[in-house]
Design a protein with these regions (language model features):
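Active-site anion/phosphate-binding pocket segments in diverse small-molecule metabolic enzymes
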Residues: 1-177
Length: 177
């Protein structure tokens, strides 16, 4: 079947785990290289640990009164006096618009809701219930501890691959040892 082919592969991450006889002499370990599951049970089987986080910073904080609309199309209206954080990540960076008014991010170790529509270049979060919050604080879209890629994928009705692969070129990659 293989003839004179020197290198043959037909196994990606899932095949490597579940069909080792199909590996031939090369494999394409995709998502498992980053520590994410390609199929149910992969994390335990290989002791996978996710290696990437998606992080930004608060660029602006503002307290608004009750009944204030947030974002385009007035899709969110505050029910109480609310402290709103603006974060410079939007759908052009890979944050799904479907997370508008239903997603969460992590600030100072706590989950806070995304409010209003996710915009092209930014989104807003309700930080009213955080004891301390300042402009410049880290914001995790995912950190693999408090919020995972899998949680985000589920909220978006998709798979972890799509969440990771749609982080755009605009987002700087920082490699650490």
């Amino acid at each position: 079947i293989l003839g004179d082919l020197r290198y043959v592969h037909c196994s990606a991450s899932n095949g490597i785990l579940n069909f080792p006889n199909s590996n031939y002499n090369l494999v394409r370990p995709g998502i498992i290289l980053y520590g994410y599951e390609s199929c149910e049970g992969a994390a335990e089987k290989l002791n996978l640990k996710p290696v990437c986080k998606f992080k930004s910073k608060i660029t602006f904080l503002k307290e608004v009164e009750a009944n204030t609309s947030i974002g385009y199309s007035r899709s969110f209206v505050t029910k109480r006096k609310t402290k709103v954080a603006t974060i410079p990540v939007g759908y052009a960076d890979g944050l799904k618009r479907v997370l508008s008014n239903k997603g969460e991010v992590v600030i100072n170790g706590k989950k806070v809701p995304i409010i209003g529509s996710v915009c092209m270049d930014s989104f807003m979060a309700d930080v009213t219930d955080l004891e301390e919050v300042s402009s410049g604080d880290d914001v995790y879209i995912w950190d693999n501890e408090n919020i995972t890629v899998e949680e985000i994928a589920k909220a978006c009705g998709t798979i972890n691959y799509e969440i990771i692969c749609t982080v755009s070129y605009r987002v700087p990659r920082v490699f650490v040892k």
